[in-house]
């Protein structure tokens, strides 16, 4: 999938609350005091998207960074951290 399509899919999934969270992401969110809604909002409004060598996207949103995978129509949040 091309960059523009991946970004569009990530933002749409975040807006529609169709994100899948790994157990690791949920644990990290709990530690950081983040919610599914705050992560979705950060992804929806993010402006920095970097494709990593492993095929996952490093996304810098307002107040947090998320690592996500775009898998066909699914957007999987692998981890979340602040900063």
What are these regions (language model features)?
Residues 1-83:
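Ribonuclease/tRNase effector modules and their secretory precursors
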